[in-house]
């Protein structure tokens, strides 16, 4: 959806397959996290878990210049998010945690719900990007609060699922 809006998109993954369809549509493939951070003002991560986020964020922050923005779209540990935010601030890089809800269908259609934690002024500057990926995008507070809201949302969804299962027994 970012490509469809006419914006230039740089991509990186340790494997080529996940980014191939984007490259075929016009995205530019980068050979490393370092080259991605050199080409991009806004770096967005969507990774499987906290360990991957910690590794990739650390590597990205090593090569990011001041004034750039790092965004984590993963569902993650609020304490890890605050740790990354502290490191980013030391490097004069802005950081937002922005976990998403809506699955692959929402991602493909640009209709994700995004719960964003971090500085409001940074959130506001990314309005055109949020418009590409989500229809319900909310700034919910400081660093880590995006993930707190997402985890509460998950807990409520799972509680409802368990209640429904119990009712059917």
Question: Could you describe each region identified by the protein language model?
Answer:
Residues 75-154, 158:
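Rossmann-fold dinucleotide-binding core
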Residues 29, 33-94:
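Rossmann-fold NAD(P) dinucleotide-binding segment
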Residues 3, 165-169:
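Amphipathic alpha-helical segments within well-ordered protein domains
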Residues 25-27, 44-46, 111-114, 154:
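Short low-complexity, flexible loop/linker segments enriched in glycine and/or proline
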Residues 1-45, 68, 104:
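NAD(P)+-binding Rossmann beta1-loop-alpha1 motif at the extreme N-terminus of oxidoreductases
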Residues 162:
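Glycine/proline-rich active-site loop of Rossmann-fold NAD(P)-dependent oxidoreductases
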Residues 14-15, 49, 119:
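Residues in the short beta-alpha loop(s) of Rossmann-like NAD(P)-binding domains
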